[in-house]
Amino acid sequence: MLPLGEKPILEHLIDWARKNGIKSVVLCVSYLRKSIEDYFEDGKRFGVNIEYAISNKPLATAGQLKTAEKFIDRTFVCIYGDSIYNFSLKNMIEQHKKSKSNVTMSLYDHKFNLKYGVIDTKNNGKVTSWNEKPEFSAKINIGCYVMEPEVLQLIPKNKPYGMDSVIRKTLAKKK
């Protein structure tokens, strides 16, 4: 229950989801289960309905998601419990539905500078250019997804499994 200001990050996430139209939340819990359940209870004081998918051991991101399968029967949002978001989830859900994809990922364009000069050379070792501490850009996963229930079929039950593996399997199926 990592705090951010006066509230746990999880409470900020639930508030953000509610403001974006989410009415029902399933929290996938494991080792911090008791403190999370005691704090959030059924979710009514947070303006949502909360249910709990429980595992007795850590299962990694997708493995934990698999524990919520019995609660999911339509398009759903999966968010990591240790991040804060400031974008329109409503727009993301609309885009997901228009695209007819099985998974829509939120991405962030991360820019960073290399600490070193980058040297380009020919095969013979002759220097052709020098770029001092160049800036690079890469799209990174920020742990918020809109998914279709069939994605859960790609996740093995009761086994640690990463979301990266689910995304790779989805890409292989071209969905």
Feature map (PLM): residue ranges:
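N-terminal glycine-rich phosphate-binding loop and ensuing alpha1 helix
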Residues: M1-E37
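Conserved beta-loop-beta/alpha segment of the NTase-like Rossmann-fold superfamily
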Residues: E37-N123, L154-P156
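Short, well-ordered beta-strand micro-motif
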Residues: P3, D120, V146-E148
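A structural signal for short hydrophobic beta-strand segments in well-ordered beta-sheet cores
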Residues: M1, V118-T121, I167
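Glycine-rich phosphate-binding loop at the start of an alpha helix
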Residues: E11, A62, D164
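Catalytic-core segments of class I nucleotidyltransferases/pyrophosphorylases
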Residues: F76-V77, I84, K90-K97, K111-N113, ...
